[in-house]
Amino acid sequence: VAAIALVGCGERDKASRIGTAILWAIDNDRTWHDGRLRNAYAAGVVASGFAKLPGWWDNTQNKWLEDRYQVGSDNGNVAWAMLALLSIDDVSASSRFRDGAARLATWVAQWADTRGTGGFTGGTFGHEPTPDVRTWKSTEHNTDLAAAFGLLATRTGDSRWRDMATAAEHFVNTMWDPACACFAAGTAEDGVTRNPILALDAQVWPLMALAGAAKKFASAITTAEQRMSVDKGFSYGEDRDGVWTEGTGQMALLLELLGRTGEAKSLVAVIESQRSPDAGFYATSVRGLPTGFMLDTDPAKPRLYFRLPHLGAASWAALAERGFNPFTATKGLPQWRPSQPFSPIQVKCFFDFDRSEFGQSRRFCRRRMTSGLHPKADMIKWAAAARKEKPPTRNPTETP
């Protein structure tokens, strides 16, 4: 998000430094060479060797430990890296950032889901060589992916990315609940059962990221105002224990994009009240702000935002101030509209059709698609078999 905010502020060179670091991390993982990114990296100068991951020395066990979430790969985080690279690409004469985004997209595409209303699952959790697969689906993640795949399709002219965007957008649309005028947070591990948690970003982001959503789902703003507003700003969820600076910035940006400038400026004033001494912004106005979620690494503990300077909060504050939409890399709402939706199974088929390494599976897909026959049971069996095949080995510097 910081890279996109820098682009929005006209700081192309600084944004490119972050983009270059992202590309370097893709190519210099200690284990993976398949186009993925980790959820976190150690801060500092990028020099040589493998990308350094955050961790700590445990004196009791006398060894180096790493957080299982941080070493994993959430598809939503990868989508934001795609958006960052594509925002830099928009002001760059080189295609390397666009190519990097395509590499990330290729990795994410394998998580297209056939259950329920499709979309993409969460990614991976834990250490190599066999991290756990996240089978839940997130409204937020799929919103990010719809925007990222859509931008990539526009920049490259490759229709398969448009198909991916359509699949992600379709999932987000089906998470809308007219009864509460809100988006569900996503699904449980079964990929079907809705997660009832009400999260601010799941209400705001679709309206900024999906064409026509700001009008179609405008009542989500009213729901957020009625159920998540606090101290003239917004909280993460319904607890309303304090202001969530990042989310307040997101709502301010949405209102600015909708032409509701007065309301947006009022929220920017609330954000300014959360300035930290280092000229950054605190994540929240309270010591610990609940999200409604529990920690993946310790399900007995709640996931909180703490009153500490937060780069995400500063980045969204900048985006709100500049009126720059990170989902479009412009100062406007999305204008493109995906083509006629394909089923999740068809989208999965289109992706693997391009991978010649899949051999027989590829030919089976060709027969089904060219004949116009799409027996769902057969397609589900094919998709399951395709996931078990070993992915192609690539040189880390090779662009898919």
Give, region by region, the residue ranges found by the protein language model.
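Extended ligand-binding clefts on enzyme/binding-domain cores
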Residues: 27-63, 70-76, 92-249, 256-258, ...
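Intrinsically disordered, low-complexity serine/threonine-rich segments
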Residues: 347-348, 352-354, 359-378, 385-386, ...
